A protein has these predicted regions:
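N-terminal hydrophobic targeting/anchoring segments and the immediately downstream early-domain regions
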Residues: 1-190, 239-358
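Loop-centered beta-sheet repeat module
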Residues: 185-220, 229-231
Length: 358
């Protein structure tokens, strides 16, 4: 069977994928996209990203999340084993995902990137190892990102998560004990301020995606460490507190933060819902988002944080994207001189400046 991927001469970087969350819910991410789609037989939210797909498509560096869903915000049919109520349950669910990443690393499927030295070693290995999955093939480099900090039972526990390889933390998804979040306005809590202090002492990066506006400004104004919005679009296109307004983008740029564009149709174009045809949004709409943010922050601070399979799938992504390995098709959405930066090197620059040396 012919390959779905052209020959890849570049490495691509995706700054937001919920790999473990999907896997613990029963999606076998060690399969190819075609095999998993055939196995699942879905007519919506068809899978976009699996480990072989990422490697074969050249997306060999990703920010992979530890994400657990608060039970009170979960769909009614969500099994309790995938959700949490309280810090202890959040911790247990998150450790399950952490252990999955550790197993994948032991199997040679991924490499967890803990330092700038690890990053350079991984980049060198991708130049020689063949695409694929498992021993002898190019593993996917993974920077671990905690999306929603409730699994951290106390701020003092954060050091343990650092030792496990977590390098980026976002305080909220909806609300957490630490901060207000998407659709749930609120400030930083006292615990949130304590957590930010611990993060800065450890050298962790702060992900502001999903922070409620009040929490965003309180966090950013007192923050001096590495900063990013791993998966956020412009509020100028879709007016929701899920996205960044121009003043937020400007504040992030002043702190040399990166912004990763989400490739979900309802987040890219006003008036588009999950039920609308895939063709409702095109790669030109991705380009429009990128140009708006770049006009404020500069192209050097624009990247991709696709969030593929983060509650949406094939049917809810722009026309022309069929799988995670289609990253190369995004090139046409950006000015030629910006393509390499947006698809890879901007994130690499940020990581080299943000990760511990060793």
């Amino acid at each position: 069977m012919a390959s779905n991927h052209p020959a890849q001469s570049r490495l691509y970087v995706d700054a937001h994928l919920d790999l473990a969350y999907n896997a613990v819910r029963g999606r076998d991410l060690t399969l190819s996209v075609d095999k998993l789609r055939a196995k699942e037989k879905r007519d919506n939210q068809e899978i976009m990203a699996t480990l072989p797909e990422l490697s074969q498509g050249g997306v060999r560096l990703v920010f992979a999340t530890i994400f657990v869903m608060p039970r009170k915000y979960a769909p009614a049919d969500a099994p309790e084993s995938f959700t949490y109520e309280g810090a202890q349950e959040a911790h247990e669910r998150a450790v399950e995902q952490l252990e999955l990443y550790q197993r994948w690393e032991a199997q040679g499927r991924i490499t967890i990137i803990r330092s700038a030295r690890d990053l350079e070693r991984h980049l060198e290995s991708t130049r020689t190892a063949p695409a694929g999955d498992g021993p002898g093939h190019a593993p996917v480099g993974v920077v671990l990102l905690m999306e929603g900090a409730d699994p951290v039972r106390t701020p003092e526990e954060l050091g343990w998560w650092w030792e496990q390889g977590i390098r980026i933390v976002g305080l909220s998804w909806k609300e957490t004990r630490y901060a207000g979040g998407t659709g749930v306005p609120g400030p930083l809590t006292d615990l949130g301020r304590q957590l930010l202090t611990q993060m800065q002492q450890l050298g962790m990066a702060l992900d502001v995606s999903h922070l409620a506006p009040e929490s965003f400004w309180q966090a950013v104004e007192g923050w001096s460490g590495p900063l990013l919005a791993s998966h956020s679009n412009s509020r100028a296109f879709v007016d929701s507190d899920r996205h960044l307004d121009d003043e937020m983008v400007r504040a992030l740029a002043q702190r040399d933060a990166m912004i990763g564009l989400v490739l979900a149709n309802p987040f890219l174009k006003a008036g588009v819902s999950r039920q609308d045809p895939k063709s409702s949004v095109t790669l030109a709409d991705v380009g429009a988002q990128a140009r708006h943010i770049a006009a404020i922050a500069g192209w050097e601070r624009v990247g991709i944080g696709s969030d593929f399979d983060g509650g949406f799938g094939l049917q809810e992504t722009p026309q022309g994207l069929e799988r995670a390995g289609d990253f190369h098709k995004l090139a046409g959405a950006f000015p030629e001189e910006a393509v390499q930066g947006v698809l890879a090197t901007n994130w690499l620059r940020w990581l080299r400046a943000s990760l511990p040396n060793q």
